[in-house]
A protein has these predicted regions:
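N-terminal donor/sugar-recognition subdomains of glycan-related enzymes
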Residues: 1-170
């Protein structure tokens, strides 16, 4: 069935049906999203984040519920999605409706990119007059990044350094 095809695409994840009927997943027993209502959890997780400057960078994004919720709240915002594992990205595309995400005019999806390239993509996608790093809200949840700890650890360090440069240069 459908879950079997998803499991063959991304064998590390266990796909299951949430109580509300949506698809959710676990990675090594850790739920990526709510086992009851992933959409509601995602909506609450992004509500009120950086409303004056709708710019966000997601380090990992699970199945995409948070990205979809954020893009519905900020349809003219800038969103950078970072995922080092292409299989996770394609599994997410198969599960969640990404229409609101792909409707964004300022969207960057960095899949399987070296960390240095991700930093450049974040910098180059900044809204003119806005600091690329210190002006953005970062979603960085261990359940979305645990599958690639080394990659995201390096990215966190370099992004923090660039955010500090943003603040100094302002």
């Amino acid at each position: 069935g459908f879950f079997g095809r998803l499991a063959s695409l991304c064998p590390r994840l266990e796909f299951l049906t949430a109580r509300n009927g949506s698809v959710t997943a676990r990675d090594g027993g850790v739920p990526l999203h709510s086992l009851y209502d992933p959409e509601r959890e995602a909506g609450q997780g992004v509500a009120g984040k950086n409303p004056s400057r709708p710019s966000a960078v997601f380090f990992g994004f699970g199945l995409g519920y948070h990205a979809a919720a954020w893009s519905r709240l900020h349809p003219s915002g800038r969103l950078v999605l970072v995922e080092p594992d292409p299989a996770r990205f394609f599994a997410a595309l198969s599960v969640v409706d990404w229409t609101s995400v792909f409707s964004l005019k300022n969207l960057v999806i960095a899949v399987s990119c070296p960390v240095s390239s991700v930093l450049a993509l974040i910098e180059n996608s900044a809204v003119p007059g806005e600091a690329a790093f210190s002006g953005a809200w970062f979603l960085d949840l261990p359940r979305f990044t645990g599958h690639s700890d080394g990659y995201f650890s390096e990215l966190r360090i370099l992004a923090a350094r660039n955010g500090e440069k943003d603040r100094i240069n302002r």
